[in-house]
Amino acid sequence: VGYELSELIWKKVRYGLSAGRVQSPALRILMEREREIRAFKPENYWVITGEFKTDKEAFLVLACEERPGEEKEAERILSIAKGGKWRILGVEQREAARNPRPPFTTSTLQQAASSRLGYSPARTMVVAQKLYEQGLISYMRTDSLNIGADAMRDIQREVERSFGKEYLYPRHYATSSKVAQEAHEAIRPTDISKGEAGAKSDEIKLYELIWQRTMASQMAAAKVLRTKISANVSGKSQIANRKSPDEIPDFTTTGNVVVFPGWLRADPRARGEEVELPEVKEGEKITLQEITSEAKQTEPPPRYTEAGLVKELEKRGIGRPSTYAAIIKTISDRGYVEKAGRALKPTDTGEVVSDFLEKNFAGYINDSFTAEMEDDLDDIANGKKEYAATLKRFYGPFSKEIKAKGKLEKATNLGEADPQFKCPICGSGMVIKLGRNGKFLSCKKFPECAGARTIDGKEMEGPKETGEICPECGSLPAGRQGKLVEREGRYGKFISCSNYPKCKYVDRSTKNEVGSMNTTGIKCPECKTGEMAERRGRYGIFYGCSNYPKCKYAIKAKPTGDVCPMCGSLMMQGTKTIPERCSDKACPNHNPHKLKR
């Protein structure tokens, strides 16, 4: 899927991009959330909070259970609240159990490391790999919740030894994922008696997280006392079927107190903040000290974080434990998403690619196709299906669709721009296009006219003239000669011809502070007249003849001024261990370390 789709994306969007049966559904999930955010319409509401004093001079903060959507209603509640006599309606208490979570799988480890430690999924897997290589944890690419019998006995003994018998509660966890392969155990320490291990800080932190979760998984539930206090001006609940304009919603608050810590002894950070409430009784009078109303707006659904995307991929059956981190890295490396704080935000390129695939290949990037393909691969691995037959059933129709969609126009042409925006050069209308740096407005007459604006209609800063004539097309008749201009490109500033794209001359020489070429003073060995000069290319700095394009001699590193004793070519700078080597790749002295052997 990926190979064929990627080739099509190169033609329809841009070379170097990619698509696939796992990365494309992941990008689609992010785009679906982005569309929800764009379509979201915020609504106003008011939060009303009151501060009260009890008979015993204790302070109590209560909030209105309803959030009025109109300011007039909020003002009505405030008015009645200020003039009424408040009483406690009721005090409800119940004991609740907080059960521990199962031991870690790959996805849950990545999620916990993200929320607790701020690690990306990729970083989590790198650190986990180091712990595994040191023999400190079990294999870290797993979707199983099972723990071996011997390890289970060791964990239970360690719980009893560390915390006491009352904290031990043996548990067995069933894997809920339909696609779980369960080839390995859950992620756990290999020696549970080691509460701390690892060579570096990040290893120590991740190991501690794994140790805590493993221990907690075999411990008793925590017991929490949950209290709810409600009050109103009349001493009677009026939250249901209010008929009188003098009635207002109940004001309430809740509190939580841990009465038995259970597994929280092993994982104290999971305890959370406890809220202890003052002792009050039903019917007790309370005195309003202050009441406030704060206007707010509903918020759109949040963008996925890396941990959130991993959770969603696992939930939908997309990918495997070994691929979650790689999926996120791929869509980031391709420029499909960028970080907005800790959230993943699709870029213009990601949006265009996803829209193109959703419109033309929806059946191959949806959840069901990906999950079914995972099932097919499992069946092939288990001998239930034949590889060739499964491939033929899928590939025939798919290859026909690829061929048919090859005739579509480029996906980077995004339609007409707002008519109010005209080309800053010729005054023609403009169209929306996708460039390397995102969406922009381009003149309809491109390439005859290179006028452009930013996506919001602002005029772009055009190329700056250098005052020099282009060495390639400068011999043309007056009026057709190109001039050298300075442009801003993906790899920084460069000099090119103003007649682009008719003339594709590019001077990649770097300049010094006074604007002259950075030459080395070393003669070009090929043309004998030019000097070796520093230039900037796609892969960084290199050195070429100052007579370019007449002479195209170039080498990778800065020449030293010496000549090779073996072949006579220029010697160039090497590395710390080999400070100098021959610039000719065919010469044995190009890799002098091999000569020493």
Where are these regions (language model features)?
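Phosphate-backbone binding and catalysis cores of DNA-processing enzymes
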Residues: 1-93, 185-233, 247-252
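Basic, low-complexity terminal or inter-domain segments flanking catalytic cores
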Residues: 6, 39, 121, 140-235, ...
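Positively charged, polyanion-binding regions of nucleic-acid-associated proteins
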Residues: 83-99, 290-296
